[in-house]
Amino acid sequence: MNEDLKYRKAEPADAERIMEIIRQAQAQMRALGNLQWQDGYPARADIDNDIARGYGYVFEKSGTAEEPAAAGTPQKCDKGRASGAVIAYGAVVFDGEPAYGAIDGAWLTGGDYVVLHRLAVADGEKGRGVAAEFMRRTEALARERGVSSFRVDTNFDNRYMLRMLERLGFAYCGKIVYGSGERLAFEKPFEA
């Protein structure tokens, strides 16, 4: 599934499309009564910082154009990249997460880990397994780098993420305080 998705580092030219996807996710969460991401987070500065630090990753759907140009309108040039639409975004962090040092509970491992923050999928791609595939590709990258586990946190009312974490084999480890509130923390250890 999803062989046509290229998992790559985000570039500054992707930032506006990423923010469009973030705004779509914020609207969906609001419509579902999910309180996460309703306070202006993540902002453009967060995404720009992710990209500058090398944390930002996207899924680019091969061979599709983002928007067809109207008749007589010049096509956008994308610095030599093959045409493709960015359909998902996440911040993939290998530097640790300071908030994870004070967990009300216990992590399953004590070694290096990868963290995924700000995972969002474009409206037209939801329900097709894109988020789960993004998580699997992030896990594969982490395994290549030799880290011992994959950690993630989410809001208590983010039902979609909670179900996906369970399906992907993550274990609930406790609660952490991150940003504006308490989050549920999960970990998936990698076998040696």
Region spans (language model):
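A short beta-loop-alpha structural element at the N-terminal edge
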Residues: 6-20
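Conserved beta-hairpin
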Residues: 53-69, 75-94
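Conserved active-site alpha-helix within GNAT-family acetyltransferase domains
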Residues: 132, 144, 156-174
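Conserved GNAT acetyl-CoA-binding A-motif
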Residues: 135, 142-154
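Conserved acyl-donor/pantetheine-binding loop and adjacent beta-alpha core of acyl/acetyltransferases
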Residues: 79, 83-85, 91-118, 126
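Conserved GNAT-fold acetyl-CoA-binding loop/helix
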Residues: 19, 26-46
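C-terminal "cap" of GNAT-fold acetyltransferases
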Residues: 108-110, 167, 175-192
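Conserved acetyl-CoA-binding loop-helix of GNAT-fold acetyltransferases
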Residues: 121, 127-140, 163-167
